[in-house]
Structures are given as structure tokens and as C-alpha cells.
Amino acid sequence: MENYIKIKDKFIIADPKDNVATARVEVKADTVLMTDDGSKIIIKELIPFGHKVALKDENRDEGVIKYGQRIGIATKDIAVGELVHVKNLSGERGMAK
């Protein structure tokens, strides 16, 4: 049996609509997390403290949601458990809609 860690022990999920979570602590690759609905997320790469992880697969040009608000768009496909940062996210702050 695998050892699971509750996702809320390692990450902050601010709103049920969020498709990213923020790391409370540094989280190593291959960490297995259990979500509230019983599904598991395997962390794909090191997630530094304060950085975001994808809670579901995101397609290129799809909105990234944090605090229940769209904070940017995916610039390439993002897999669940992957770091969400400038390498795959474009912020929309200050951009005309």
C-alpha cells in the first residue's frame, strides 16, 4: 500500500474552482497526494515553497484559476502534478480584455 499525504498538508487550495494549489512547503517529485475526493496526485517535479502545482491537466490557452479567479493562461499543455510557473503560464494582469 502506498503512503499518501493529504494534499492540504502540503498545499493551499483557496477556492473549490482553483485548478492550481500553492505549496505550503517544498514538495519533492514523486510525492503522492490524496485529494478530498479520494483521487491521488503524483508530483512530477520539485515544487518550491510558495509555487503552484496543477491540480488537473490543462491545455495550452486554457485559463489558470487561483483564489477562484483567472490569473493567466497556459502557454503549453500542463500535466496534473506539474509546476505551474513562467515556463508554462502567462499572466494577464494589466492586459485589456
Listing of model-derived features with the role each one plays in the protein:
Residues 1-66, 70-97:
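Well-ordered secondary-structure scaffolds
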